Each structure stands twice: as C-alpha cells, then as structure tokens.
From Swiss-Prot:
Domain of life: Eukaryota
Location in or out of the cell: Cytoplasm; Nucleus
Reported function: Plays a role in transcriptional regulation as a repressor that inhibits monoamine oxidase A (MAOA) activity and gene expression by binding to the promoter. Plays an important oncogenic role in mediating the full transforming effect of MYC in medulloblastoma cells. Involved in apoptotic signaling pathways; May act downstream of P38-kinase and BCL-2, but upstream of CASP3/caspase-3 as well as CCND1/cyclin D1 and E2F1.
Name of the gene encoding the protein in the UniProt record: Cdca7l
Name by which UniProt lists this protein: Cell division cycle-associated 7-like protein
Composition bias, Acidic residues: 75-86
Organism: Mus musculus (Mouse)
Quaternary structure and partners: Interacts with MYC. Interacts (via IBM motifs) with PSIP1 (via IBD domain); phosphorylation increases its affinity for PSIP1.
Region (MYC-binding): 201-223
C-alpha cells in the first residue's frame, strides 16, 4: 500500500511518549528505528485523510487534560508495564498489507477451531485482551483514525495466536496416538481375558470328564461285586448246536415269488372229479333207457311257471292308475319295494305295464310311463286296461340296448330330442324312417 504523503511526527507527540510515567520512565524510541518508518505507519492508518491533504499538520486541540490523565493512569496489571515498541512491531506498522493479511487469516482460522482450542483460548483471552487494549489504546486515543480496527491487532498477538494453535495441534496429535494406543491395549486386554476364560472352561470340562469316568468305574466295580445283578451264562453244549445247512452251489437258485404257507389249503381242495370213463358212461345210458322202457315210454314233464304274478284287467285298481308316472320327476326310486323298467333299468315304485302274453313274464313286459311314451308312443294307462296288450319285446320292436345288442345292433342312446327335432313323436317311428331310407 502506497502512502499518499509522508510527514514527520510533531514535537508535541514525541514529548508525550518521552514524558516519564508514575512507575517507570519511558525511555523513548530506539535510535536504530528511523522516525520515518513510524511516520509511514501513521500515514497508512490515516490514508483517507492524507490523500486529501498534502501537508498534514498536527492539531493541538486533541491534547486535552483528559488525554494527559489517561496516559498517566496505572496499567491494568501492576506486574506488567509498558516498555515501548519493539523493532518487529515498528516493522509491522510500516507494512500495513502484512497486518491485514494476518488479521484476515486469523479471522478465518477462528471458526475451524474445535472445543479444546476454544477452552485453551478462553484461558489466554484475559492476557490478550489486556495487552491488546494496552498496546492499541495509545494509538487509538492519540491519533483518532477511522481505520483503527485494521491495525488494532499487533504482531505480538498474532504470534501468540499462532503459538497457541501450534501447541493445540501438537496436543491433539499427541492425543490421537495415545487414544490409539489405549484402544489397542484395551483390545489386547479383552483378547487375553477371553483366552483366559476359554482356557478356564476347557480345564473345568476336562476335570468334570475325569470325575465322571472315575465315578462310572467305581459304580461298575460295585455292580460286578454283586453276583445277582450279572448271572454267569453257561455256554450251550455241543450236542444242542445245530448243524449248519449245506449251501447248494450247483446251478442258480431261483427266487420264490409266492412261497407256500402253512395256512394255505391243499391243492385241488373242494374240486369235484367230472371225468367219466367210457364204461361208466355206457352204463349210465343203459340204465336210463331201461327206466324209460319200463315206464312205457312216457317221460315226466315239468310245467313251466311264470316268474312274475299275472294280473288281469279286473285286478287293476284306480289307485294303480293314479300311481302311473307321467314325467321323469314323478318317478320315485326304491331299491327294496320298487320294480324295474325293461327300458331304463331303474327301480321305482310307480305302476308299470303288464304283458298279457302267456309266454312273457318278469321284467321283460314292464315299462314305465316316460319310457313307453318316448320310445314307442304308447300310454301305460291304455296298456293296463287292454286285455290283449303285449310288450314291445314280444312284438319284436324293442329298441333297448339289450335287445339291440342281441340282434347285433348298437345302442341308440337318448334319441327322443333328435326324433322330435325331425318331427317324430317317438324313437320307434324315427328308427323306422331311417330303416326305410337305407
């Protein structure tokens, strides 16, 4: 920073600094320090006013009785006195740019300080405050410059701050290896304790095993001493020993898949011998013919009986007619009391037809209402009241699965819907139309 003007310090200002104090005389400025350097530092602090004035003159109105009283007062500390400026402080005052850079560096370094540095700085703060106030107090009162804040911190304070920072860093760096050493020592102690515990557990386990083995051996010895617990077994005699079976090495032995059992009945159990010899057969035929000739040639004939009961028209009651099933929903299934229909083979309790043919009987002539109407176009009520009615099997028109299979034909299945689709009332007419077309 270039100074606008350079002027010498007036005589009055020099007299103030050279005047003796209460406790110790002020020796004055050193001889080796030129007065021109001090004047340059003063001019740098008041650069704004010096730019406007080429010839700066000292104004005596600033030196009042109060100013003189302030300089004559005792310092803050009785043990510490002001001994004047050193050469480094004077050089610092001659280079204001260096002062500003150090001040800015110190201001930037303050936020980065940790808690430990703040604690250490709080202890050093009273001393710095006193020295700062003492060193900058005279300049502030003597010169009344507007830029006094820039040059308020001297080199001594900055050097003290730097020394304190370096000491704190050294302490911090010394603490870190100590902390690492402490953690390493703690880990070693823990590992030693664990190994000691493991060794103690293994030792205790070995002792327990040894004690258990000794106790078991003692118990076995006591049991062996009592003969009742362990009776002596005599080896079997040589005569009772079974002779080992001879192994067959000739040929391959086939595995028995179905071995014989003691509970299985013998072969040909409950079987009759139907084989006849020729002589015995001729004897039987001869005896049969002889009996026939003795009886006069008339053989006894047996009358064929109907399996089912024959019911005439007079035996049909009104209750039987009301019990006729018109649709499939009217049919009630009963496997005990019901009778079977020849067409559908379902055992129901509804009234069915009765064939009037003397040679027909049983299930052959029984048809339920839905089957007789859909398959043949007839009514059960009319069939029961007709004394000459015969069943479809007797007439040779039965189209059930059994009768068609007997005739060498396949079963038709449910054809009533298809027959009605083509305009026929029953399956018999539909099958007859198909037979005519073929």
């Amino acid at each position: 920073m270039e100074l606008a003007t350079r002027s010498q310090i007036p005589k009055e200002v020099a007299d103030i600094f050279s005047a003796p104090s209460d406790d110790e005389e002020f020796v004055g400025f050193q001889d080796d320090v030129p007065m021109q350097n001090l004047s340059e530092s003063c001019g740098s602090l008041d650069s704004r006013e010096l730019e406007k004035q080429q010839n700066v003159c000292f104004r005596s109105k600033y030196f009042t009785e109060e100013l003189r009283r302030i300089f004559k007062e005792d310092t803050d500390s009785e043990m510490e006195d002001f001994e004047g400026f050193t050469e480094s402080e004077l050089n610092m005052s001659s280079n204001p740019e260096l002062m500003e850079s150090e001040l800015s560096d110190s201001d930037k370094a303050y936020p980065v300080m940790n808690d430990a540095e703040e604690d250490d700085e709080e202890e050093a703060a009273p001393r710095r405050g006193r020295s700062t106030r003492r060193s900058s107090f005279g300049l502030r009162v003597a010169f009344q410059f507007p830029t006094k804040k820039l040059a308020r911190t001297p080199d001594k304070d900055s050097s003290h701050l730097l020394d304190s920072k370096t000491d704190l860093r050294r302490k911090k760096s010394s603490r870190q290896p100590k902390g690492k050493e402490d953690s390493a020592s703690d880990a070693e102690d823990e590992s030693r304790a664990e190994s000691q515990e493991n060794s103690d557990a293994l030792l205790k386990r070995a002792m327990n095993i040894k004690e258990n083995k000794a106790m078991l051996a003692q118990l076995l010895a006591e049991l062996n001493s009592v003969p009742d617990f362990f009776p002596v077994r005599t080896p079997p005699s040589a005569s009772r020993r079974r002779t080992p079976r001879r192994a067959f090495s000739e040929g391959q032995i086939t595995r028995r898949m179905n071995p014989t059992r003691s509970a299985r009945p013998p072969e040909k159990f409950a079987l009759e011998n139907f084989t006849f010899s020729a002589t015995k057969l001729t004897e039987e035929l001869y005896s049969f013919r002889r009996r026939k000739t003795i009886s006069g040639g008339k053989c006894q004939t047996y009358r064929r009986h109907r399996i089912s009961s024959f019911r005439s028209v007079k035996d049909i009651t009104e209750e039987d007619l009301e019990n006729i099933a018109i649709t499939v929903r009217d049919k009630v299934y009963d496997k005990v009391l019901g009778n079977t229909c020849h067409q559908c083979r379902q055992k129901t309790i509804d009234t069915k037809t009765v064939c009037r043919n003397q040679s027909c009987g049983g299930v052959r002539g029984q048809f339920c209402g839905p089957c007789l109407r859909n398959r043949y176009g007839e009514d059960v009520r009319t069939a029961l009241l007709d004394p000459k009615w015969t069943c479809p099997p007797c007439r040779g028109i039965c189209n059930c699965s059994y009768c068609r299979r007997r005739d060498g034909r396949c079963a038709t299945g449910i054809l009533i819907h298809l027959a009605k689709f083509y305009g026929y009332d029953n399956v018999k007419e539909y099958l007859e139309s198909l037979q005519k077309q073929l």
